Amino acid sequence: MKARLIATGERAPSWVAQGFAEYQKRLSHWLPFELVEIEPGLRGKGRDARRATEDEGRRVIAALPKNAYVVALDVPGRQLSSEQLAQRLEHWRGQGRDLAFLIGGPEGHSPEVSALADEKWSIGPLTLPHMLVRLVVAEQLYRAAAMIANHPYHRA
């Protein structure tokens, strides 16, 4: 099983790229994990945000691995504790499918992308910059994998 984080947005600043690379390296023992950055749709004065979201959606769909289990990060999605995420990760491993975690653009996911999601996950009620969400997802996947492996990283 492999995991892919498909994130709509600009190229990550160095501090995000460095943090992501650190968790990606740590996760590599248990779960190969890659980042795919999706170019954001054009927004601004006189531009249609709906069209930008639809354009992003087409690019996200094209980046999905075949037969992947799709988890869309979405504000109204299900909130999981770290322990619950570890249980989900074990369940997903049992399915034998690759995973795709999706971070949408400023207006969220297109209806087409939302319809493809096998489940929706919310980081929580806080509003976070999408770049920070990349790090939170990477860290929480590492924490979940460490819990499954009885690694001492997680101490609750």
Curated annotation (Swiss-Prot):
Molecular functions per Gene Ontology: rRNA (pseudouridine-N3-)-methyltransferase activity
Catalytic reactions of this protein: pseudouridine(1915) in 23S rRNA + S-adenosyl-L-methionine = N(3)-methylpseudouridine(1915) in 23S rRNA + S-adenosyl-L-homocysteine + H(+)
Keyword field contains Transferase: yes
Keywords of the record: Cytoplasm, Methyltransferase, rRNA processing, S-adenosyl-L-methionine, Transferase
EC primary class: transferase
Principal subcellular localization: cytoplasm
Cystine crosslinks: none
Any Pfam family hit: SPOUT_MTase
Residues that, per the record, bind S-adenosyl-L-methionine: 73, 104, 123-128
Subunit structure: Homodimer.
Family: Belongs to the RNA methyltransferase RlmH family.
Name the UniProt record assigns to this protein: Ribosomal RNA large subunit methyltransferase H
Originating organism: Stenotrophomonas maltophilia (strain K279a)
